């Protein structure tokens, strides 16, 4: 769990930034492939101990890819505590939208091999976003998959708490960043 506050954004030339991020994405993906995939339960315990959430906070999770930390045990624990949950819905070039979800709900296929709540589920505005990542730096800037979905979403939601879920090796001193990149909390 990474908790950092927003810092000033410093830009790099676009071509160099794209190249640096692409190289780092590959390194991080390769490293993450070799990690244990049973981090969900310890993550849930650590999060519940460390992150104070209002009783009525709406929490957004994500449906994990095979090499990502699995947030489902945490989402199940939050649901048991009475929190409303939602998962992201992806539309190319737009901020994420969020639809209500419970651990018993069936998901449908979304873009980019994602899983998302069905279109008949109500939209929700999360107070806390659990965010997947490939790497995160000491200022809270994350390296995602390159689509900019979470950056656009964090910029729009503004006051929502952004919490990155990562293995320790995914933390680094400073990542390349552009003016559009938004840090996690």
Report residues per predicted region.
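N-terminal active-site beta-alpha-beta segment that forms phosphate/nucleotide-binding
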Residues: 2-124
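Short glycine-rich anion-binding loops that position phosphate/pyrophosphate groups of nucleotides
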Residues: 64-67, 134-138
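Generic detector of intrinsically disordered, low-complexity, polar/charged segments
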Residues: 58, 107, 141-145, 161
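A residue-level signal for conserved active-site and pocket-lining positions in enzyme catalytic cores
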Residues: 28, 61, 85, 130, ...
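Surface-exposed, charge/polar-rich loops and edge strands
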Residues: 2-23, 30-34, 120-129, 137-142, ...
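Short, structured patches in soluble enzyme cores that scaffold and shape functional sites
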Residues: 89, 116, 133, 166-169
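Charged helix-capping and loop-helix junction motifs
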Residues: 76, 145-150
């Amino acid at each position: 769990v990474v908790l950092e506050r927003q810092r000033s954004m410093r830009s790099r030339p676009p071509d160099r930034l794209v190249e640096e991020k692409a190289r780092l994405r590959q390194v991080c993906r390769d490293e993450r492939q070799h990690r244990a995939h049973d981090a969900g339960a310890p993550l849930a315990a650590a999060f519940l101990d460390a992150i104070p959430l209002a009783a009525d906070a709406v929490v957004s999770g994500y449906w994990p890819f095979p090499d990502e930390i699995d947030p489902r045990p945490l989402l199940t624990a939050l649901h048991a505590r009475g929190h409303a949950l939602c998962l992201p819905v992806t539309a190319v070039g737009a901020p994420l939208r969020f639809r209500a979800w419970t651990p018993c709900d069936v998901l449908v296929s979304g873009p980019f091999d994602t899983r998302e709540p069905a279109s008949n589920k109500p939209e929700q505005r999360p107070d806390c976003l659990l965010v997947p990542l490939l790497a995160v730096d000491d200022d809270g800037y994350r390296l995602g998959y390159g689509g900019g979905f979470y950056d656009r979403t964090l910029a729009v939601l503004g006051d929502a708490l952004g919490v990155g879920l990562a293995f320790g090796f995914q933390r680094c001193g400073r990542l390349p960043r552009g003016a559009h990149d938004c840090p996690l909390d």
